[in-house]
């Protein structure tokens, strides 16, 4: 079975073709970073308009890359949520229209299920059960995963997501949008221990997160110590260490609570090298394993949507002809496969 995947939930247009026998056949991606850079963040209307311009040409490019035509596609998967409603509607409308025209089934895919299953695209894929740490610009969640659609929310951020905190703190440090990856690069030049940031909510039981206070702590630290290059790097280092430590502490608790030996990290922030290193070290000490996707599959992409859609379609799930999206969509509401 070959599935075309369409991802348009935010500011990346991702198109891919996945085959259940041979794997990923094509992967096309267009990022809108330059489009939104002047505004310091994603402008929903601009994002939607750009998806309109890019989605069909990228589908054509993906089919060409895979040396396929429309008749070779057995199903279409599109991101139906969560995300920006206008952006989601572009992918959903194109996906449903193509499926109808080609006479194949279409399936709406949950964006975060796509991220959660992205490590399955790798040769060393995780087996169930595992704890998933989903860390992105919009989500920070710990989830018990015992099968496809068998998701139990263990904890989540009560305010800012980890990726959002990275971007906001980067802005305080004078870095351009998107600042998260730039902050991480700056942190590599920082001196460990010059500044010590708190590890929010780690001094109390539970698996929820809170990152908004770190942004405030960073702002106060910047005000008190100036903005010379080394000080900025030292603050970036202290901030990143605090976020990474917090994620590691909570992940360890989730593993202890569930008794699982496998940890999956997914979402844009899972590409962070410091986080990967910290969690790998933690899992080695515990005699467990950590799994993650290659960097290009950590951020939004069509490959994860094509793969998740393939699994859903093979289980017999497909949507009605109507086009609907869900900007807010709890992962736990997904049906078991």
UniProtKB/Swiss-Prot annotation:
GO terms for molecular function: iron ion binding; N(6)-L-threonylcarbamoyladenine synthase activity. Belongs to the KAE1 / TsaD family. Fe cation binds at residues 111, 115, 300. It catalyses: L-threonylcarbamoyladenylate + adenosine(37) in tRNA = N(6)-L-threonylcarbamoyladenosine(37) in tRNA + AMP + H(+). Binds 1 Fe(2+) ion per subunit. GO terms for biological process: tRNA threonylcarbamoyladenosine modification. Its cofactor is Fe(2+). Substrate binds at residues 134-138, 167, 180, 272. The keyword GTP-binding does not apply. Its main location: cytoplasm. Its EC number is 2.3.1.234. Disulfide bonds: none annotated. This is tRNA N6-adenosine threonylcarbamoyltransferase. Required for the formation of a threonylcarbamoyl group on adenosine at position 37 (t(6)A37) in tRNAs that read codons beginning with adenine. Is involved in the transfer of the threonylcarbamoyl moiety of threonylcarbamoyl-AMP (TC-AMP) to the N6 group of A37, together with TsaE and TsaB. TsaD likely plays a direct catalytic role in this reaction. GO terms for cellular component: cytoplasm. It is an enzyme of class 2 (transferase). It holds the Pfam family TsaD. Keywords: Acyltransferase, Cytoplasm, Iron, Metal-binding, Transferase, tRNA processing. It is found in: Cytoplasm. It comes from the Bacteria.
């Amino acid at each position: 079975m070959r599935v075309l995947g369409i991802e348009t939930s935010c500011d990346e247009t991702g198109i891919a073709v996945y085959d259940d026998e041979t794997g990923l056949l094509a992967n096309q991606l267009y990022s809108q970073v330059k489009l939104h850079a002047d505004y310091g963040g994603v402008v929903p209307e601009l994002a939607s308009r750009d998806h309109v311009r890019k989605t069909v040409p990228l589908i054509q490019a993906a089919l060409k890359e895979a040396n396929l035509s429309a008749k070779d596609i057995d199903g279409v998967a599109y991101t139906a949520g969560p995300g920006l409603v206008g952006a989601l509607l572009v992918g959903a409308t194109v996906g449903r229209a193509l499926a109808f025209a080609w006479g194949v089934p279409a399936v709406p895919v949950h964006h975060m299920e796509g991220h959660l299953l992205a490590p399955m695209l790798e040769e060393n894929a995780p087996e169930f059960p595992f704890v998933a740490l989903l860390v992105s610009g919009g989500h920070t969640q710990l989830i018990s995963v015992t099968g496809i659609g068998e998701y139990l929310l263990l904890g989540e951020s009560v305010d800012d997501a980890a990726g959002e905190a990275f971007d906001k703190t980067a802005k305080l440090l004078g870095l351009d949008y998107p600042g998260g990856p730039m902050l991480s690069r700056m942190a590599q030049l920082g001196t460990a221990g010059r500044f010590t940031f708190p590890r929010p909510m780690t001094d109390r039981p539970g698996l929820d997160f809170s990152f908004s206070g770190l942004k405030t702590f960073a702002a106060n630290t910047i005000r008190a110590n100036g903005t010379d290059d080394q000080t900025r790097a030292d603050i970036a280092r202290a901030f990143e260490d605090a976020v990474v430590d917090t994620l590691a502490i909570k992940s360890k608790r989730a593993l202890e609570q569930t008794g699982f030996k496998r940890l999956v990290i997914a979402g844009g922030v899972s590409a962070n090298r410091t986080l990967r290193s910290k969690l790998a070290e933690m899992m080695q000490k515990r005699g467990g394993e950590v799994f993650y996707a290659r960097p290009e599959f950590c951020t939004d992409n069509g490959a994860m949507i094509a793969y998740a859609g393939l699994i859903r379609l093979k289980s017999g799930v497909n949507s009605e002809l109507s086009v609907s999206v869900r900007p807010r969509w709890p992962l736990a509401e997904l049906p078991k496969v």
